[in-house]
Design a protein with these regions (language model features):
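Short aromatic-glycine-enriched beta-strand elements
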Residues: 50-60
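Short nucleic-acid-contacting surface segments enriched for D/E, G, S/T with interspersed K/R
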Residues: 82-98
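Bacterial N-terminal signal peptides that target proteins for export
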Residues: 1-11
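Bacterial N-terminal signal peptides
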Residues: 9-19
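Disordered, low-complexity segments in secreted/periplasmic proteins that are enriched in proline
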Residues: 129-139
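Short boundary/loop segments of OB/S1/cold-shock single-stranded nucleic-acid-binding domains
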Residues: 23-38
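Conserved hydrophobic positions within beta-strands
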Residues: 42-44, 95
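OB-fold/S1-family single-stranded nucleic acid-binding modules
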Residues: 103-128
Length: 139
């Protein structure tokens, strides 16, 4: 094998080694089940505005009266920031509706590809929801 071919082989291997984990990270189907949509109405209890995704904990009153906290995965903070969203736009205690898909893991309270709709109708889109993380910024 020539030196040029060897360098090309090594470069290709490095690129593949670096991009495979990134692709796996963004494979929604690895963690979430698109055949299990879920709609939640509840109160924001916690917001984690950190990379690589924001997470919003939403407390929901189940039909039997028990309170359950769901962890809703959102888009990347920088994506939302570029659209005009800020950490302060969602508030602890705010009533929201969440539309997303359930996690595959039994017993998991994680929700992916979620759209969070505030009481005044603003929408914040999660990774892959609504055609990506695009959505109107707060008014």
């Amino acid at each position: 094998m020539s030196l040029k071919a060897s360098i090309l082989s090594v470069a290709t291997a490095v690129v593949l080694a670096v991009t495979a984990p990134v692709a796996a990270h963004h494979a929604v189907s690895a963690e979430f089940d698109s055949t299990k949509p879920i709609t939640l109405k509840g109160t924001i209890k916690r917001i984690e505005w950190t990379n690589p995704h924001i997470y919003t904990n939403v407390e929901v009153k189940e039909p039997d009266g028990t309170l359950v906290v769901y962890r809703v995965e959102g888009a990347a903070p920088n994506t939302l920031f570029r659209q005009g969203w800020r950490k302060e736009d969602l508030k602890i205690g705010e009533l929201v509706t969440v539309n997303g898909i359930r996690a595959k893991a039994a017993g998991s309270m994680n929700v992916g590809q979620a759209t969070i709709t505030t009481a005044d109708g603003r929408k914040i889109y999660g990774q892959g929801a609504g055609g990506g993380a695009r959505g109107p910024a707060p008014q």
